[in-house]
Amino acid sequence: MGGVGLFYVGAVLIIDGLMLLGRISPRGATPLNFFVGGLQVVTPTVLILQSGGDAAVIFAASGLYLFGFTYLWVAINNVTDWDGEGLGWFSLFVAIAALGYSWHAFTAEADPAFGVIWLLWAVLWFMLFLLLGLGHDALGPAVGFVAVAEGVITAAVPAFLIVSGNWETGPLPAAVIAVIGFAAVVLAYPIGRRLAAPSVTNPPPAALAATTR
């Protein structure tokens, strides 16, 4: 994933995390999901069309669709009020695919930092599956906090370092990202509930009834 695209992935993860925390309305988060989702679909399509059949280029571009489709789906759900069950099950597909991309980063690319980043994305998208696909609504604040944290440590910061020419992969960056990222996952539930808006942690009776229908 190129540095420019990754930078805006960081932005949309932060915005969507704040949405899950109840700090931004779904409609307020929609435009950026359309922008970044469109970017993450158009960019790999152009790369593949210009690849001349280069397998490495095609493989690198293929993972972008996982995120592009996710953000476009979020945007469409937000403006149509469709339920998130389908997106939740797609998130399980993304989580499993991310494990494969992580393995490829560790082995074929000798890039442990992005190997860890892909692992953290797998965890986040699996949490989205639990939240949306299986309906574990109580996880909403936890998923929101992890999305914000990963937006910073797996996307925005690495992307800024990449585009500024200061990015270095290796065991040390991988270890730093892993420690911060997995600590965020472990602490997600209590911190998420502390950061969430009252309407998320203590929904009114009408909202509770809506989630159980």
Curated annotation (Swiss-Prot):
It comes from the Bacteria. It comes from Mycolicibacterium smegmatis. This is Putative amidate substrates transporter protein. Belongs to the AmiS/UreI family. The chain crosses the membrane at residues 4-20, 32-48, 56-72, 116-132, 146-162, 172-188. Possible transporter that might be responsible for the adsorption of amidase substrates or release of their hydrolysis products. InterPro entries: AmiSUreI_transpt, AmiSUreI_transpt_sf. Coiled coil: none annotated. GO terms for cellular component: plasma membrane. It is a multi-pass membrane protein. Its main location: membrane. It is found in: Cell membrane.
